[in-house]
C-alpha cells in the first residue's frame, strides 16, 4: 500500500507540536534575518501572474508529483498518496485516484501561514508528524480531524528553476545544520525518501527529490488572447519566386499587363512560456484568432483580418491567396521570362492568454510565431526580367 496506517511497532501517529527547542530555533532564525518571518525565496524568475494564478486554483484538486524518486523507491511511485484521515502520506503510482488528490487553502496574510495543503480523501490538512516510537523520524501525515491546531500544517511553496515545480517548506519544523553553530538554523522541506516514503531535509537547490510538480486536475478554457504588438520582432523569410513567360511577336516595343495568382502556405504557432505554476489550458476548435500581419516592418492588426488561427503549439498551415498585377515592357520580337520575388516574414509576437474554469481566471504569457507572405500592394515584389 502507498498509504500507511498506524502500526503497533511504530506506535501512534501524531502531529508535530511546538516545543521549547522549536521556539528557540525560530527566535534565532528571526533574529538572524532581522525579524523577517523567513528568507523570501521568490525572485525575478517568478512570473508576474503566479500570485493570481495560484489564488485561482485554491481549493481545486491538484496532484503533487516528485521530480525524481529516491534510490530504493519504485520509479513509478512518484505521486503523493493517502486514503484517509490520520494516516501517513507516502508515494504511490496513481495520478487519478481520490488518494492522489489534494487542494490548497490560502489564508489571510495575518495568519502567518502561506498555504495549507489538504487531502481530498480526508478533507483534513497535511502536517508534519511522527510515530511515537520513532519521534526523530518525521513524516508527512493527514490530520485526524479539523479540530486541532494548525501549528504543524503550515507550508510555503518555493519555486524551482524547473518550471511548475516547488520545494514544499514546513513553516513549523526547523533544524540546525551545524551543532557547533547556533545560527545555522533552517526550515525543513519535504523530501522523497527510500521505500516510497516522504521525510524532510535541509533545502538543496536542484535536488530532484525535494522538488514537486503541483498540477491542477481541472482544465481552464481559453477565453481570449491579447497580442503585445509593440514588442514584436520581425525578420525576413525566404522569398517566394514565381516565373512568368511572355512573348512579343511584333517588331516594336509593347507594354503587357499581367497578373500573378498563387496560393502560399503560411503558418501559425502559439508557444506558451512555462510559468511558475503549471496549468492546463484547453482551447475549443471553435475559438480562433486573427494573425498579426507584417506592414512597414511592424506587426499590426488592422481589424479586418479573418480569425483563422487556432491556439496550439502544433504548426498550423494556412492557405494564403496572393494576387499581384503589374505591367512590363516587352522588347520587339522577344521571349521574356519574368522572375517575381515575393517577400515573406517571420513574426514573433508576445501575448497574454486568459483562461477560465467557472469563475476562476488564470493568465499565461507566450509567443505567437507566424510565417507570413507580404501583401504585394504594401511590400512591392522584386521583378527580374530576362529577355531572349
What is each model feature region?
Residues 279-299:
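Short hydrophobic membrane-inserting alpha-helices and related fusion/pore-forming segments
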Residues 7-224:
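Lectin-like carbohydrate-binding module/patch detector with strong preference for beta-trefoil
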Residues 16, 43-48, 196-280, 299, ...:
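Core pore-forming/fusogenic effector modules of secreted, proteolytically activated toxins
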Amino acid at each position: 500500500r502507498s498509504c500507511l496506517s498506524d502500526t503497533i511497532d511504530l506506535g501512534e501517529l501524531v502531529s508535530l507540536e511546538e516545543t521549547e527547542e522549536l521556539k528557540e530555533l525560530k527566535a534565532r532564525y528571526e533574529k538572524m534575518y532581522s525579524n523577517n518571518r523567513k528568507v523570501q525565496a521568490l525572485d525575478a524568475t517568478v512570473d508576474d501572474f503566479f500570485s493570481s494564478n495560484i489564488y485561482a486554483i485554491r481549493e481545486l484538486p491538484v496532484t503533487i508529483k516528485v521530480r525524481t524518486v529516491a534510490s530504493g523507491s519504485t520509479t513509478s511511485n512518484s505521486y503523493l498518496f493517502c486514503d484517509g484521515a490520520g494516516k501517513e502520506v507516502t508515494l504511490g503510482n496513481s495520478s487519478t485516484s481520490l488518494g492522489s488528490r489534494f487542494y490548497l487553502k490560502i489564508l489571510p496574510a495575518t495568519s502567518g501561514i502561506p498555504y495549507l495543503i489538504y487531502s481530498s480523501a480526508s478533507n483534513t490538512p497535511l502536517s508534519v508528524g511522527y510515530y511515537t516510537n520513532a519521534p526523530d523520524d518525521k513524516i508527512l501525515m493527514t490530520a485526524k480531524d479539523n479540530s486541532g491546531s494548525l501549528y504543524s500544517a503550515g507550508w510555503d511553496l518555493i519555486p524551482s528553476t524547473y518550471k511548475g515545480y516547488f520545494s514544499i517548506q514546513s513553516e513549523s519544523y526547523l533544524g540546525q545544520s551545524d551543532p557547533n553553530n547556533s545560527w545555522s538554523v533552517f526550515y525543513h522541506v519535504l523530501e522523497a525518501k527510500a521505500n516510497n516514503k516522504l521525510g524532510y531535509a535541509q533545502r538543496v537547490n536542484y535536488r530532484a527529490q525535494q522538488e514537486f510538480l503541483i498540477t491542477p486536475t481541472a482544465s481552464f478554457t481559453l477565453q481570449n488572447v491579447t497580442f503585445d504588438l509593440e514588442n514584436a520582432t520581425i525578420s525576413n523569410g525566404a522569398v517566394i519566386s514565381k516565373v512568368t513567360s511572355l512573348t512579343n511577336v511584333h517588331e516594336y516595343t509593347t507594354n503587357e499587363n499581367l497578373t500573378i495568382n498563387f496560393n502560399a502556405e503560411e503558418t501559425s504557432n502559439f508557444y506558451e512560456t512555462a510559468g511558475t505554476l503549471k496549468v492546463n489550458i484547453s482551447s475549443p476548435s471553435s475559438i480562433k484568432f486573427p494573425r498579426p500581419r507584417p506592414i512597414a516592418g511592424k506587426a499590426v492588426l488592422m481589424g479586418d483580418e479573418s480569425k483563422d488561427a487556432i491556439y496550439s503549439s502544433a504548426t498550423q498551415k494556412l492557405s494564403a491567396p496572393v494576387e499581384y498585377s503589374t505591367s512590363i515592357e516587352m522588347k520587339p520580337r522577344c521571349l521574356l521570362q519574368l522572375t517575381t520575388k515575393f517577400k515573406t516574414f517571420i513574426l514573433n509576437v508576445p501575448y497574454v492568454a486568459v483562461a477560465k474554469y467557472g469563475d476562476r481566471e488564470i493568465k499565461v504569457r507566450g509567443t505567437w510565431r507566424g510565417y507570413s507572405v507580404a501583401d504585394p500592394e504594401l511590400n512591392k515584389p522584386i521583378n527580374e526580367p530576362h529577355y531572349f
